[in-house]
Amino acid sequence: MSRAKLEQLGLELPLFPTTSVGSFPKPDYLVRARADFVKGKVAAAHLRELERKATAFWIETQEKLGVDVLVDGEMYRGDMVAYFAERLPGFTEGGLVRAYGNRYYHKPIVTAEVSWPGPVTVDWWQFAQALTKKPVKGMLTGAYTIMDWSFNEHYPDRRSTAMALAAVIRKEVEALIAAGCKIIQIDEPALSVRPEELPIAIEAMEYTTKSLDAYFVTHACYGEFEHIYPGMLDLAVDNFDLEMSNSDLDLLEIFRRHPFTKDISFGVVDVHSHKMETREAVRRRVESALTILPKDKIWIDPDCGLKTRTVEEAIEKLRLCVEAAKSFRS
């Protein structure tokens, strides 16, 4: 059904479509400029010019590699939740909280009714899409994850916070669709953190995507999915983007016990390691997927965003994805 939906949207993709989860490493010149901007040494207009330059580089790079569905690389974003919290009325900035390793972010605080100020991602999607004839994914963070990664000082409970955010994210989805976006990824990395709250995440996603004309992807990672599977299949999306290689394909055994009914963006390279996989290792991962999953439901991509790798590493890991996909098509 999902491939039929893509065709209805005017998208003709090959078997084993290749894509990326969202983020790419920022070039050194942009890293320096972002730091200088915070210090007041770089004007906003100049920073935006450099962000556009870096975005164009990654669109061109993906095209040269032969990636099928592109991403803008998020050159203009830092943290995936803070980006939205900084732009949505109702949030204030909290103190620094460790995200993972030695990476920190200012944990947002919901202090008033959240609202939609107008599009906060559409201009960047339009810029990226204008650079290519291939489809570019719209990239959003889901309502449940924004709620879970924020403090709440306004709403009576976590569900009402998530649903208020779902109403806001839906407006952004509608704006992307109105601009011509046909594939929209709504990231929910917090999906498996509190298994007892899966119904909240499902309800929030249902509100976000219901009756809207797009192909929806969600990316979830870092979790123990056995606690929420197969219930998570009720999430109102067409495609789950899952971190498979970093978990040694453990999820495949869960799928063996209960069929996976969605399309899957199957992570075949580990984004947390500087080590480069061999072509043979990547092929074996795809072969393992094919023992359980139908070939017309498998997309191929990295495990997660590539922003923590070097530019060179990110390119090579993407190249491995594309080479694997092409080898299985033939």
Stretches with model-predicted labels:
Residues M1-S330:
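Domain-level signal for soluble alpha/beta catalytic cores
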